[in-house]
């Protein structure tokens, strides 16, 4: 039997921050930061979110600041 090929071209993920013209990622903007955190509280990687390297670094700093200030959890509660 011949194998069937599946799939096709995957759609390229769009950088949410660049697409919405967000220049400064504020650590107090928890609604924005929660988009880039998993349900367990971990920072999502670039390959999942589609952010650029520059914006991923800015996001990481903002998320870590928000965690230290107590605005975001370090780990999710069960």
UniProtKB/Swiss-Prot annotation:
One Gene Ontology term from the biological process aspect of the record: translation
Q: Which SUPFAM superfamilies match?
A: Ribosomal protein S18
What's the domain of life for this entry? Answer: Bacteria
Q: Name one GO cellular component term.
A: cytosolic small ribosomal subunit
Q: Which cysteines are joined by disulfide bonds?
A: none
Keywords associated with the record = Ribonucleoprotein, Ribosomal protein, RNA-binding, rRNA-binding
Q: Does the keyword Plastid apply?
A: no
Q: Name one GO molecular function term.
A: small ribosomal subunit rRNA binding
The annotated subunit structure for this chain is: Part of the 30S ribosomal subunit. Forms a tight heterodimer with protein bS6.
Tell me, in a sentence or two, what this protein's role is: Binds as a heterodimer with protein bS6 to the central domain of the 16S rRNA, where it helps stabilize the platform of the 30S subunit.
What is stated as this protein's family in its record? Belongs to the bacterial ribosomal protein bS18 family.
Q: What is this protein called?
A: Small ribosomal subunit protein bS18
Organism equals Ligilactobacillus salivarius (strain UCC118) (Lactobacillus salivarius)
Q: Which gene encodes it?
A: rpsR
